[in-house]
Amino acid sequence: MKTMRKQIYKKAYWLLLPFLPLALANTFLVKEDSKNVTAYTPFATPITDSKSDLVSLAQLDSSYQIADQTIHNTNLFVLFKSRDVKVKYESSGSNNISFDSTSQGEKPSYVVEFTNSTNIGIKWTMVKKYQLDVPNVSSDMNQVLKNLILEQPLTKYTLNSSLAKEKGKTQREVHLGSGQANQWTSQRNQHDLNNNPSPNASTGFKLTTGNAYRKLSESWPIYEPIDGTKQGKGKDSSGWSSTEENEAKNDAPSVSGGGSSSGTFNKYLNTKQALESIGILFDDQTPRNVITQLYYASTSKLAVTNNHIVVMGNSFLPSMWYWVVERSAQENASNKPTWFANTNLDWGEDKQKQFVENQLGYKETTSTNSHNFHSKSFTQPAYLISGIDSVNDQIIFSGFKAGSVGYDSSSSSSSSSSSSTKDQALAWSTTTSLDSKTGYKDLVTNDTGLNGPINGSFSIQDTFSFVVPYSGNHTNNGTTGPIKTAYPVKKDQKSTVKINSLINATPLNSYGDEGIGVFDALGLNYNFKSNQERLPSRTDQIFVYGIVSPNELRSAKSSADSTGSDTKVNWSNTQSRYLPVPYNYSEGIIDADGFKRPENRGASVTTFSGLKSIAPDGFANSIANFSVGLKAGIDPNPVMSGKKANYGAVVLTRGGVVRLNFNPGNDSLLSTTDNNIAPISFSFTPFTAAESAVDLTTFKEVTYNQESGLWSYIFDSSLKPSHDGKQTPVTDNMGFSVITVSRTGIELNQDQATTTLDVAPSALAVQSGIQSTTQTLTGVLPLSEEFSAVIAKDSDQNKIDIYKNNNGLFEIDTQLSNSVATNNGGLAPSYTENRVDAWGKVEFADNSVLQARNLVDKTVDEIINTPEILNSFFRFTPAFEDQKATLVATKQSDTSLSVSPRIQFLDGNFYDLNSTIAGVPLNIGFPSRVFAGFAALPAWVIPVSVGSSVGILFILLVLGLGIGIPMYRVRKLQDASFVNVFKKVDTLTTAVGSVYKKIITQTGVVKKAPSALKAANPSVKKPAAFLKPPVQPPSKPEGEQKAVEVKSEETKS
């Protein structure tokens, strides 16, 4: 188990959120970076059985309960319906279908929109209420409804439904030859069998006119419950009133040895308990009429787009209509449903017509509206809805065809093509067939049917269909006629044999290898020989699916508001396909649609080891067209080679998984009308033994996770009805199961000539072993491959238990369960200090760690950017193995920071103080701590400052030397130049002085005589004074010369 689960490891981004206010007891988180709750957020829609607060918020009375709910763009949409509702049908007048005001049954279903009005936790406030009205009925439609009858649905107590082999029960073959029906008593005694059907055997039977059928205005049939204390027999008739006994006797099948009707009531079909489990409404012990049941069942599933709300039915009772409500509608607006009869589903009508032709050997040769399927007044399709969802503002839906009614209304009886079909209802039902391990060669030979020898074991799987034919008013203009049963078989192929034998109930395949022999619900048999073309068996079901655009929804709304008979809605991107009704496959037998069985087509169908095999539940394996849990989502990865599957959807059907991959192109639907270019790819993966052991009727919830590409289907099978009609715990059965389906899987590609198989990785597995002792269970949340959360009610209090995987079986972890606490209405389990709870335990270091680790020289930014240092500030004690945690730091100042933990939860994801969902804080309550005393400046700031100063001085010195040395050289050159100049000046001065001296001397000679006369006067020395200035060079001429030289140097440089 553990190895298997590792192969399908789920990265489930889910967090358990218990105890929400306003009785939204459970909601769950997504990835921490998610800013929005969407329709695809895993478990964003709360799952709980107690919704009284939402009911009161919607201003509805206590009779209302929640049928479905979804979240669209953070708003919550809830579908409410009342168990007190009563609807009536009147064949005359204009208001044919209406709420019954005389019995205070005017309690229609509602869709209510809520919004969150707080930023702390969730507090829902009503935005708008939409009422779901009853449908308009045109005159043509009324002609159909007047004579339409509905057959009893299957329940866990339906006759012939419990076919699974039980431990300790002996199953035997009963041989009845031609004319030996009266030997039943001896056969019974020989094998020690009871006169009434017991869990290990089933009785075939023939219904007389009107048995188990009801018109819309009549009460739903109910039959005597089984009493296991009387060896499988029914309760004594004294426990019934005479009216109830008489009604039950008239509607019970004939099961006596000779095939005649019994004078006393001693047989059964269903119980009140079983009918209530599928949604049948009662007034005390009396079921309400059929039309009320159909309305109540039709308001079961909800999907929301940007502009529309769509409501459809369920998998138990047929839906004849669906609602499309405009979100802009006023609260008091009349929101009428659209008839499926007024909706064209592409590929569907041809498939349905072909199915009837194949079954009855009847082929229509004209296209006039007077023939069966071309006239709305003679057809009434109904669907068992497996689910609806919305993706990218488009609706995805799927379901099974519950049945239809049609007539060959040709007036000629002379034509060989019409004589055998005139006045015959061309219809089919949801019944399955006889099963045989060896085929029907020995069972059905020639035309003997069951009057011939029975040399092999076989069983009848089902005995009831849903919508069945009627006859009497079979012409286009006929208005009167008796109501009688018309069998869906040609007149000349009817069998008159009475089928009343006890038959071995070995669960086998649904097809014969020597031809197809089928018994219908009414005790008539026909067969196709092996030399004839392989035709779909009546065990095959018509599975309808598609994607609906906003424009098509608007058309459906317009049709609903119309009272005309010619308003048609075209849903273009829909398809139909035959699906087999697998029980146990036999080798060499062809599957539906020409597919080979898994054993012969190269597929590896593995039964996982370590899983406890559980005997298939009779109901789950007998209801032929049962399907649950359609869930769609954005699928970015293509599934089939060469195809881009933008949207993916998964639905579980009886026997396997259907994957639908929608290819709408560039976020818009394909506009092509070419049916060969299908916008939808289809794949069917058969269940293995492990999945087949899960009772699909116990389905609770489905989630899709886009990141992992996994769908998780949750089933609650802890309580099952026993064969004595009482709710008793099944002690040897697991409480919960989770079927996990991957985005990819076995992909079937079919053409006209061959059938090939592409095998992609598949993650189809059952997570079982989750068992709870609580009485009221609301769901299972797979958190990871190691942990699951079981949500239950214990003494009217919501309780969360955490289960841990222990070698494939999940066992409760008491410590973790106790630690999942609330946070005063917050969204997440709160953290508890000084205790190892689900978040583990965080212990912070003292502030002295800064000095001890020499961190006082580091700054806040350094610490924040160094996780190794940051994580040394705390010690983490995990709550479970491999749980991890880290610290998230916030800068408080230049010298301090605040830290808080970021912890891994059970879902594998990390959460911190800032985690939100839809923008709302989680308020987990993680602790925080401030560390102070870090360096205001980094340790490198002072050294760098000093170094910078020294560097600058050094640069200046270098620059100074670089400039000073050349200037010194220039100065020396200047000095040398000055010396030379001054030498030249001195030479010149000397020369001039010599000239002057010679002049003076000569002048003195001229004046010698007069000078001699005055020789006594010595103070006259003028020449000496004249020569003095040239000998002393002034400073100014020196400066002017330096400037010139420097300029010259600059010029040179």
From Swiss-Prot:
Sequence intervals crossing the membrane: 946-966
What topology does it adopt in the membrane?
A: Single-pass membrane protein
Reported consequences of knocking out the gene = Probably essential, it was not disrupted in a global transposon mutagenesis study.
Keywords associated with the record: Cell adhesion, Cell membrane, Membrane, Signal, Transmembrane, Transmembrane helix
Cleaved signal peptide residues: 1-25
Q: What compartments host this protein?
A: Cell membrane
Indicate what this protein is called per its UniProt record: Mgp-operon protein 3
- The protein's organism comes out as Mycoplasma genitalium (strain ATCC 33530 / DSM 19775 / NCTC 10195 / G37) (Mycoplasmoides genitalium)
